[in-house]
Each structure stands twice: as structure tokens, then as C-alpha cells.
UniProtKB/Swiss-Prot annotation:
Sample GO molecular function, one term: ribosomal large subunit binding
Entry-linked InterPro entries: Ribosome_recyc_fac (IPR002661), Ribosome_recyc_fac_dom (IPR023584), RRF_sf (IPR036191)
Keyword annotations: Cytoplasm, Protein biosynthesis
Name of the protein this chain belongs to: Ribosome-recycling factor
Gene Ontology terms describing biological process: cytoplasmic translational termination
Species of the source: Nitrosospira multiformis (strain ATCC 25196 / NCIMB 11849 / C 71)
UniProt-annotated location(s): Cytoplasm
Main location: cytoplasm
Superkingdom, taxonomy of origin: Bacteria
Function: Responsible for the release of ribosomes from messenger RNA at the termination of protein biosynthesis. May increase the efficiency of translation by recycling ribosomes from one round of translation to another.
Family the UniProt entry places it in: Belongs to the RRF family.
Gene Ontology cellular component list: cytosol
Length: 185
């Protein structure tokens, strides 16, 4: 029973960590990366579709993303979708390609993005602590129902605390890396 609770808590913590990685990946830095356009959708035959489902996305250089639509008629729609996204990008069409240059970040924008990163990190830490709280509550319920002994409950709580500490350390590493990436000029 205790092993199941720990396994469940670890799976939930892993999902929270993956969600944080996705959220941090959407925050634009000065460098181009293809994952930046993953959440941008375009209208494709009446259905909102991710750009990477209707075009090849690649890097031309460190500061430029190129988008090559599989259908020429999608050029305008994809360019418009990128321009209207909340990324602050200004794509241009060159022949059958869409070039998306990464504008350099201003110092003020870097600070704002750093605040966003810290906020996302704190939300992930809170999620980890909530998972810990739920697991500990489940252990207490088992103790009340006399399905486990006090020693087993205490050991389970210690294990869950170690798990929580490990995942929070992982969050801190992710945040430090993202902040360093943002502040690099």
C-alpha cells in the first residue's frame, strides 16, 4: 500500500516537472529553437492545427527559424498565425519559406521574462507540495484505519519528503538554467 502511494506521488511529481519543462520551453529567449512554435495553431481546413503538423520547422541559424509549409496556400495563414501569437515575432515570406527572425530581447523584457520563469517555478513547487500533502493525508488515513503501523507511516512520510526534495531540486536546476539562458546576451 505504501509503495503504491509513493509510486503514485512520484508519477504525479514527474508529470508536474514535465509540465514545467513545457511551460519554460514556450518562454522566448534570444535564441531560436523549433519548439518555440509548437503551441501556435493555424486554421487548416476549418480545424485549428499545430504548425508543426502542416509544415517543416527548422533552424536557419541561431536567431532564425524557417517554416516550410507542405501546401503553398498555407503560407499566408501560417505567417498570420505566427504574427498573431503572443511571442512577439515578425515573420516574413521569402518564396515558399517563412523566415522568423528572433528579435534581440531588451534588458527590461529579460527581467520581465525572468519574473515569469520564477512564477512558473513557484507554481511547480506548490504543485509538488500539494502532491506531498495528498500522499501524507492518504498515509494518515491508512493509519487511522489501522491498515499500517505508526512506524510505517513515519517511514512513508520520510520517503515522500525525500521524493519531494529531489523534485524541488530538479525544479530549481531548471529555473537556474532558464534564467541564465534569458540573461545571456
Amino acid at each position: 500500500m505504501i509503495a503504491e502511494i509513493k509510486k503514485s506521488a512520484e508519477q504525479k511529481m514527474q508529470k508536474s516537472l514535465e509540465a514545467l519543462k513545457l511551460d519554460l520551453g514556450k518562454i522566448r529567449t534570444g535564441r531560436a529553437h523549433t519548439g518555440l512554435l509548437d503551441h501556435v495553431t493555424v486554421d487548416y481546413y476549418g480545424n485549428p492545427t499545430a504548425i508543426n503538423q502542416v509544415a517543416n520547422i527548422s533552424l536557419a541559424d541561431a536567431r532564425t527559424i524557417t517554416v516550410a509549409p507542405w501546401e503553398k496556400k498555407m503560407l499566408g495563414a501560417i505567417e498570420k498565425a505566427i504574427r498573431n501569437s503572443d511571442l512577439g515575432l515578425n515573420p516574413t515570406t521569402v518564396g515558399e519559406l517563412i523566415r522568423v527572425p528572433m528579435p534581440p530581447l531588451t534588458e527590461e523584457r529579460r527581467r520581465d521574462l525572468t519574473k515569469v520563469v520564477k512564477h512558473e517555478g513557484e507554481a511547480a513547487r506548490v504543485a509538488m507540495r500539494n502532491i506531498r500533502r495528498d500522499a501524507n493525508a492518504h498515509l494518515k488515513d491508512l493509519l487511522k484505519e489501522k491498515k499500517i503501523a505508526e512506524d510505517e507511516e513515519r517511514k512513508g512520510q520520510e520517503d515522500i519528503q525525500k521524493l519531494t526534495d529531489r523534485y524541488i531540486a530538479d525544479i530549481d536546476k531548471l529555473l537556474q538554467a532558464k534564467e541564465a539562458e534569458l540573461m545571456a546576451v
